[in-house]
A protein has these predicted regions:
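Two-component/phosphorelay signaling modules centered on CheY-like receiver
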Residues: 16-34, 101
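Non-catalytic signal-transmission and effector/linker regions of two-component phosphorelay proteins
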Residues: 1-11, 17, 40, 75, ...
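Short amphipathic alpha-helix used as the core "switch/output" element in two-component signaling
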Residues: 44, 67-79
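Alpha4 helix (beta4-alpha4-beta5 surface) of REC/receiver domains from two-component response regulators
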Residues: 67-68, 89-106
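Hydrophobic/aromatic residues positioned on beta-strands within the core alpha/beta folds
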Residues: 85-86
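Acidic, metal-coordinating helix/loop segments flanking the phosphotransfer/catalytic sites
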Residues: 35-53, 58-61
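A Lys-centered signature of the CheY-like receiver
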Residues: 109
Length: 132
């Protein structure tokens, strides 16, 4: 965010169109949202602007999964807070994601919208992990 009057910019990486639309409708009043349906598409968007938050599902179509995308995104935009959403809590996945991509948060589906909104707000209140 460059100006306090601007809404934080969020990149939503979600392949389920109905869920993506619902999240955009619900979160769009507080955040400026760009969307992608694959890691490849999201990586292209990273080259077009700076994002404050990267919110991404773990299970995605194509060769790259959510953690793969977040790892690459961390190199391109280290200032962006990284939030992973997964349908299952796997301790190995959580440990890998915490150490490799320095997550701001990891949420397990189903996620209540207010929990998601508060998680994004909490992430924005602090620098991205690894940033001062």
């Amino acid at each position: 965010m460059t100006d306090a009057s601007q809404r934080p910019v969020l990149l939503l990486l979600e392949d389920e169109s109905q869920l993506k639309a619902a999240l955009c409708d619900t979160l769009g009043d507080e955040f400026e949202i760009e969307t992608a349906t694959s890691a490849e598409e999201a990586l292209l968007l990273l080259g077009t602007r700076k994002f404050d938050v990267l919110l991404c599902d773990q299970m995605l179509p194509g060769k790259r999964q959510g953690l793969d995308f977040l790892g690459e995104a961390m190199l391109q935009q280290p200032q962006a807070r990284r939030i992973l959403v997964t349908g299952y809590l796997n301790p190995e996945l959580l440990a890998r994601s915490t150490s490799l991509v320095q997550l701001s948060a990891c949420l397990v589906k189903p996620v209540e919208i207010e929990q998601l909104r508060q998680t994004i707000r909490d992430a924005l209140a602090h620098p991205a992990p690894g940033q001062s």
